[in-house]
């Protein structure tokens, strides 16, 4: 979203064209409104996107956590550390099953850094210190391989790569699955850190109960 500089939206009421400016402090950002609407307000016919220099340096890691909420605390620490990872996604135990990267007994953190300017050893080292301090386990050899060359492909393999592939394939599975009697969908939300644990538990319980009541079938709900 941060790379979008301007958009042109065709709506039933007319055309909305935003200005091509690197930034503006004049009220709400209309481009955010257009992007977030996901087609409900109109059809995006044009978009200007800031070109980015492809990263030359990459580092990636996946970590396992026996305690899901310890993993959540780890993600909070990473988010507030100033390290700014390019990818920081936490999969709860159920989500690891859907992604084919776990057996449902542990949570998994997918972590990555990218840069065109500098090697990433110091950033990854500090991130892994945070991971370890929260009880996470990772493959040090795999992390080292991910930083072994400027053209590393290690970040596309292993657990992190398997999750990425599953994430990209999921939209293509959704419609065929309906023909097999399986309905899959996602919804997004946000909550403050201090309320996350009770919120997570409540959503899982309430949504599972609602699906079972409506379909008579046991539902599977996961979080990432």
Residue ranges and their predicted role:
Residues 53, 59, 63-64, 72-224:
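C-terminal substrate-recognition/cap domain of FAD-linked oxidoreductases
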Residues 1-89:
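FAD-binding subdomain of flavoenzyme oxidoreductases
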